[in-house]
Amino acid sequence: MNEPLKHKLFSVYGQILNIKALNEAWKHVKANRGAEGVDKVTIQDFEKNLDENLDSLLKSLKEKTYKPSPVRRVYIPKKNGKMRPLGIPTIKDRIVQQALTDKLSPFFEKEVFHDNSCGFRPGRDAELAVKKIVSRLEYGYFYVYDFDIKGFFDNIPHKKLMKVLN
């Protein structure tokens, strides 16, 4: 990884080491609701002592003692009758994930993702994808590639990913 890019990515951790970033992340987590993690702490439970919980989380992040908890595994049915495993993180882990997402997303949107990619991106949806396709067809392009990598997330080489992240 080139040094300027590496610096941009790795300075993100420092950007979440403040109560404002954690509060903003908390607002997203609360709005998304969601079930409790392995610690059985609900959104309502966490909110009862919000300031104390966020301060404690911030302290652990600053002291680099924060460790994510295991996820609570549940299975949801797929259309084909099979079951899809779903990992539910704890509230505090969701807050850290959201804080990092808040800081990383603008970088990836600008520097990494292709403008024509519309899947799972803020402000982009199937309707925009169709408009982009129609625009390209009107411009003279006549091929469209649509693909779905089956089991993509299940097959990410985690050792390689962790090596890149470290």
Model-flagged regions — what are they?
Residues M1-D51:
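Non-catalytic, polymerase-adjacent accessory regions of viral genome-replication enzymes
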Residues N2, S11-G14, L104-H158:
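Active-site-proximal segment of RNA-dependent polymerases
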Residues L17-K27, S60-M83, I91, I95-L104, ...:
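Reverse-transcriptase-like RNA-dependent polymerase core
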Residues A31-Q44, P68-I95, V112-R124, Y145-D146:
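Short, conserved non-catalytic motifs in the polymerase core
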Residues M162:
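Conserved S-adenosyl-L-methionine
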Residues L165:
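Carboxylate/His-rich catalytic cores and anion/metal-binding grooves
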